[in-house]
């Protein structure tokens, strides 16, 4: 199409220039003489249009058909060529807009100053610039040309003899006599004389004669006037003008037009390339918009997940506090009701005795009546203790400001340096956010920056985030990249978030590339930190105590990273009842956090370099994804396809030797095989028919591992992971303290003897509950032990069917609550004496 358009443009431009610059003396002859180069250029344009590079049938239709009526241009339709190189019938051009009073005799058009709109491209042009389309005029004039050439006479002599030959060099028709003379003259004897057609010079092109000298052909090209002339006109009207022979002029003009066509073709190819690049950029911009939408939805999903998790923690904490108060009040109410009934009976009997007329009976029963009356008066009834008010505290203004500052979209121009997100101004002015390392610029890089205040009303300062510290980073690099991306949907969250709910405190840092996930740091509280440019929060900074007489549900003072490797906590954290304190580098082991204790922690986070991104193999997540469900540490993790729990290879039960596939399911989600099909004749106690104690069968081994993995993943069981490493437990029972880690080692046959039956496994777990129960006097802890025991028994029953393990579990002692000052002897009767 480019070659066709270029050839057509060049040929039409040459035709228009020649017609416009014709002299008055050779007006019609000049117009007719232009048919020779014009026809040649039209043939070249037609060939280019029909080639594979051409525009096809539509481009050819625009060249040979009217742009208005779509009819083929014929001489009888008076075809016209506009300056924009579009063709149209003279009748289809329509009336011109008058712009001047001058009229032109060219085809009866409007005045020279009138404006005409092109029917194809709507470009305006002057009517004087519209010329006749000589290419299409010659298409139907072959017959008339042949009849005219048949009567052509010789022009070399005065005899008017019919011409039988034609000299190509002289462009003259010759008779037989002149041909012989032509071949005798030394100057003309080498000329080419054709006898095939007296008036034919080329196939498809007829000879054009001068309109002044009717018998003289147009064989010269006047360079000064830029028009075709005959020999007589060149000697008279164009005397002393520079001229060329027709063949030389055509050759030179073709070279000039070919050079222009080549230049325009190169420019057109560059334009096509740029057009493709712009179209590709449009698609890239659309892809960037979709990717930004996905990033925003992913950030919102992560925030809602953290809100859901935090909401469950707060609800559980409130439930624990209220359950203890409710149980104590119920026991007090039961005691008071019993005393009340006893006093009512004494009052009723004493009143009945006083109203009785039997004086003898009154005197005989005086001792018993006095005894019960004095005994009832001695009973001490404790007053009702006022219970403190419990309320949920949160800063609405801070959360509103945090929501208003939720992220930002930064579009970087190509060539600019990426310096990372600047410090965001949070509601409570935390320390500045700094991102270490330098990153390469992207054509369109989306960066999200967040700054928020703390949700702890008693906190005096904000934690300072200086980056991310990786753990388990030396476990090797795995090629490839496969990440488990959660579905962006609100139906998966079981927390009802109303319109008044606010997002948690969080900060977002961009990934190293546009394909990496952004680092979202969730803050569920704040610890005391040095203001300004302080490095990290010092561990162990005390928080402000709660108000007296008010039960406050404590919030966790921790930070969680989503989409990037979370840092290992550097100090203990405040957790609910039976939640462990995260061990730091110098800690001896996990400890139980007292409900009344108040601690705070600092977290140092070191950001990874932007220029490098960790990669992982199929089925494995690097430490930037999440933390292990068992050990709560980052690293190379595998994610379950169903529950989306993440585990280290050695933390999962059974331990994984290789990285599983993408559709891997953990032991908690895997369907257990039927006990009867797997075990055969082997009983639950692990002994065979000969009475020799054997190891656990493969089916029982898998079921025990599933139950133990459920205990490891159960949040309230976290203090029981490593009881034996704590000095407190070692002093109570030296050498005999059990914890989940030792039970796992024995189940994996790392300690001897291994378990031989599920009952033995259940006995060890029950003994662990009993040991922990002896070490605590807190009623809430005892209540939690009862809940853990029920959880374990439920898991065992689910794994082993109808088999009951209640007998092997140690039942913790009942709660010894006060009986309002009454002993069992006093409530039983007066048999003890006064």
Swiss-Prot record:
Low complexity: bias regions: 13-23, 38-52
Any GO BP annotation: positive regulation of DNA-templated transcription
Originating gene: Trim28
GO molecular function, one term: protein kinase activity
UniProt binding sites for Zn(2+) 1: 154, 157, 178, 182
Protein name, entry field: Transcription intermediary factor 1-beta
Location in chain, cross-link Glycyl lysine isopeptide (Lys-Gly) (interchain with G-Cter in SUMO2): 35, 128, 200, 255, 262, 273, 305, 320, 367, 378, 408, 435, 469, 507, 554, 575, 750, 770, 774, 779, 804
Main function: Nuclear corepressor for KRAB domain-containing zinc finger proteins (KRAB-ZFPs). Mediates gene silencing by recruiting CHD3, a subunit of the nucleosome remodeling and deacetylation (NuRD) complex, and SETDB1 (which specifically methylates histone H3 at 'Lys-9' (H3K9me)) to the promoter regions of KRAB target genes. Enhances transcriptional repression by coordinating the increase in H3K9me, the decrease in histone H3 'Lys-9 and 'Lys-14' acetylation (H3K9ac and H3K14ac, respectively) and the disposition of HP1 proteins to silence gene expression.
This protein's record includes keyword Nucleus: yes
Annotated source species: Mus musculus
């Amino acid at each position: 199409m480019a070659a066709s358009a270029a050839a057509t443009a060049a040929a039409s431009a040459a035709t228009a220039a020649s017609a416009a610059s014709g002299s008055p003396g050779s007006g019609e002859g000049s117009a007719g003489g232009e048919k020779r180069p014009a026809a040649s250029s039209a043939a070249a344009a037609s060939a280019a249009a029909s080639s594979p590079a051409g525009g096809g049938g539509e481009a050819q239709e625009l060249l040979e058909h009217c742009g208005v009526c779509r009819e083929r241009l014929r001489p009888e339709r008076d075809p016209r060529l506009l300056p924009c190189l579009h063709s149209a019938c003279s009748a289809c051009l329509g009336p011109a807009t008058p712009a001047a009073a001058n009229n032109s005799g060219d085809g009866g058009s409007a005045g020279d100053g009138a404006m005409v709109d092109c029917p194809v491209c709507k470009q305006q042009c002057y009517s004087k610039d519209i010329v006749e389309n000589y290419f299409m005029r010659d298409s139907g004039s072959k017959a008339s040309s042949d009849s005219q050439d048949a009567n052509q006479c010789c022009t070399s002599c005065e005899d008017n003899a019919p011409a039988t030959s034609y000299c190509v060099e002289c462009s003259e028709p010759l008779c037989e006599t002149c041909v012989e003379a032509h071949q005798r003259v030394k100057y003309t004897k080498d000329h080419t004389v054709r006898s095939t057609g007296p008036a034919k010079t080329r196939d498809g092109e007829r000879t054009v004669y001068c309109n002044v000298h009717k018998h003289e052909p147009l064989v010269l090209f006047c360079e000064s006037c830029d028009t075709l002339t005959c020999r007589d006109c060149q000697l008279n009207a164009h005397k002393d003008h520079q001229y060329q022979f027709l063949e030389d002029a055509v050759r030179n003009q073709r070279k000039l037009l070919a050079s222009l066509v080549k230049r325009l073709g190169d420019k057109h190819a560059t334009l096509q390339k740029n057009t493709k690049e712009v179209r590709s950029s449009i698609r890239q911009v659309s892809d960037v918009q979709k990717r930004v939408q996905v990033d925003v939805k992913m950030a919102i999903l992560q925030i809602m997940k953290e809100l859901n998790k935090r909401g469950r923690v707060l609800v559980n904490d409130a439930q624990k506090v209220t359950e203890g108060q409710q149980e104590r009040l119920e026991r007090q109410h039961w005691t008071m009701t019993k005393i009340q009934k006893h006093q009512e009976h004494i009052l009723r009997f004493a009143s009945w005795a006083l109203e009785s007329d039997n004086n003898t009976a009154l005197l005989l029963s005086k001792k018993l009546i006095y005894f019960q009356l004095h005994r009832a008066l001695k009973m001490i009834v404790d007053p009702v203790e006022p219970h403190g008010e419990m309320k949920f505290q949160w800063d609405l203004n801070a959360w509103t400001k945090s929501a208003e500052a939720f992220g930002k979209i930064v579009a970087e121009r190509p060539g600019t340096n990426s310096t990372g997100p600047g410090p965001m101004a949070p509601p409570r002015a935390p320390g500045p956010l700094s991102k270490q390392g330098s990153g390469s610029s992207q054509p369109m890089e989306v960066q999200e920056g967040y700054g928020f205040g703390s949700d702890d009303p008693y906190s005096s300062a904000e934690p300072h985030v200086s980056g991310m510290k990786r753990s388990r980073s030396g476990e090797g690099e795995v090629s490839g990249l496969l990440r488990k991306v959660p579905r962006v949907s609100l139906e998966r969250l079981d927390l009802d978030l109303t319109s008044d709910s606010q997002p948690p405190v969080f900060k977002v840092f961009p990934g190293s590339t546009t394909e990496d996930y952004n680092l979202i740091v969730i803050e569920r509280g704040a610890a005391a930190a040095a203001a300004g440019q302080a490095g990290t929060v010092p561990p162990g900074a005390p928080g402000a105590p709660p108000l007296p007489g008010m039960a406050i549900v404590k919030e966790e003072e921790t930070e969680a990273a989503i989409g990037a490797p979370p840092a290992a906590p550097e100090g203990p954290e405040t957790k609910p009842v039976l939640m462990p304190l995260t061990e730091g580098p110098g800690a001896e082991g996990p400890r139980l956090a007292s409900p009344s204790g108040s601690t705070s922690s600092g977290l140092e986070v070191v950001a990874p370099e932007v220029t490098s991104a960790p990669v992982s193999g199929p089925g494995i997540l690097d430490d930037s994804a999440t933390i292990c469900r068992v050990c709560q540490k980052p690293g190379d993790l595998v994610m379950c396809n169903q529950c989306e729990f993440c585990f280290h290879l050695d933390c999962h039960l059974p331990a994984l030797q290789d990285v599983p596939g993408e559709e891997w399911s953990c032991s908690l989600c895997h369907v257990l095989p039927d006990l009867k099909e797997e075990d055969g004749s082997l009983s639950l106690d692990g002994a065979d028919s000969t009475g020799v104690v054997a190891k656990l069968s493969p089916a029982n081994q898998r079921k025990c591992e599933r139950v133990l993995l459920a205990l490891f993943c159960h949040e309230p069981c976290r203090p029981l992971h490593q009881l034996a490493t704590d000095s407190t437990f070692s002093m109570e029972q030296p050498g005999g303290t059990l914890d989940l880690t030792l039970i796992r080692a024995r189940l994996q046959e790392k300690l001897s003897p291994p378990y031989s039956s599920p009952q033995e496994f259940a006995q060890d777990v029950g003994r662990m509950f009993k040991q922990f129960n002896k070490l605590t006097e807190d009623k809430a802890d005892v209540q939690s032990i009862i809940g853990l025991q029920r959880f374990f028994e439920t898991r065992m029953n689910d794994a082993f069917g109808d088999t009951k393990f209640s007998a092997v579990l140690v039942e913790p002692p009942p709660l010894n609550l006060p009986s309002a000052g009454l002993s069992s002897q006093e409530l039983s009767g007066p048999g003890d004496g006064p």
